């Protein structure tokens, strides 16, 4: 119990960072017996649902929208973290769904060629990104998995789990692919491996516009926050911002509402000004 006190618990633990925080997603606990899916493989965002987690994703969507409206060329977002199990894939798929519901054309790329967690959402198809990067015999259009309910939401899975993921990502065909996709989509989210394990996220990030860094409450040790601040100050990742995931909601209140919940303009924008 004592060592749990060293973990990030909520927004208060991030107050000393100058890294902007885009949003806070409350802990999602699924009824596993009911749907036979782990919490990591569930789409919780629904068009007319007004529960706490859907409201949290709407706030996050508004904040991402505000960023993009300031620079319409910014449409490729890398999602990474320090730890495995931070909920990157869960966030990537649900943020994407929140934009698809608004009628935006959205793509999620599974950039974790080692585990393919996003791919599990769409049945882990045998053909995907690794096959394209390795051979380029396939058109990227053939890799797309289209959502059954929202035809404007697509996923590119990993496909074959390769023995040499880093080498594949360093191939020039990745840059060519992302450039082509920019012309087709409003938003592109790339789920990447944690940065402390392999170099893959840094390789992919050079083709992206912004980095969403997932901090999982109850998982990330507070001692790593200074490292996150260093990464931000040294600009090792472009336009880094935090998404806090898995916070405990208290007393039925919207625990993620901290300062900018009623509109990005009133909160996040002024938050950025304060940090300058």
Describe these PLM feature segments.
Residues 197-218:
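Inter-motif core of Ras-like GTPase G domains
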Residues 64, 158-199, 205:
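Phosphate-binding/switch loop-helix module in NTP-utilizing enzymes
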Residues 130-180:
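Conserved Walker-type P-loop NTP-binding/catalytic site
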């Amino acid at each position: 119990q004592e060592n749990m006190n060293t973990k990030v618990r909520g927004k208060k633990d991030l107050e000393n960072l100058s890294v902007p925080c885009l949003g806070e997603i409350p802990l999602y606990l699924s009824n596993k017996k009911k749907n036979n899916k782990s919490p990591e493989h569930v789409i919780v965002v629904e068009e007319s649902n007004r529960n706490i987690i859907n409201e949290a994703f709407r706030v996050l969507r508004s904040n991402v929208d505000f960023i993009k409206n300031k620079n319409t060329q910014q449409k490729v977002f890398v999602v990474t973290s320090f730890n495995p199990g931070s909920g990157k894939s869960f966030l990537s798929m649900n943020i994407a769904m929140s934009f698809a519901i608004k009628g935006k054309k959205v793509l999620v790329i599974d950039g974790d060629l080692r585990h393919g967690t996003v791919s599990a959402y769409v049945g882990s198809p045998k053909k995907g990104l690794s096959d394209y990067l390795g051979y380029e015999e396939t058109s990227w259009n053939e890799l797309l998995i289209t959502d059954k309910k929202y035809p404007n939401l697509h996923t590119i899975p990993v496909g074959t789990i390769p023995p040499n993921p880093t080498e594949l990502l360093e191939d020039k065909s990745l840059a060519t692919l992302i450039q082509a996709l920019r012309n087709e989509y409003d938003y592109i989210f790339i789920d990447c491996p944690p940065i402390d394990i392999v170099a893959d996220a840094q390789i992919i990030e050079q083709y992206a516009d912004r980095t969403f860094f997932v901090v999982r409450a109850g998982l990330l040790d507070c001692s790593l926050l200074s490292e996150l601040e260093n990464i931000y100050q040294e600009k090792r990742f472009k336009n880094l911002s935090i998404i806090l995931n898995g916070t405990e909601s208290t007393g039925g209140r919207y625990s993620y509402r901290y300062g900018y919940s009623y509109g990005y303009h009133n909160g996040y924008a002024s938050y950025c000004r304060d940090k300058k």
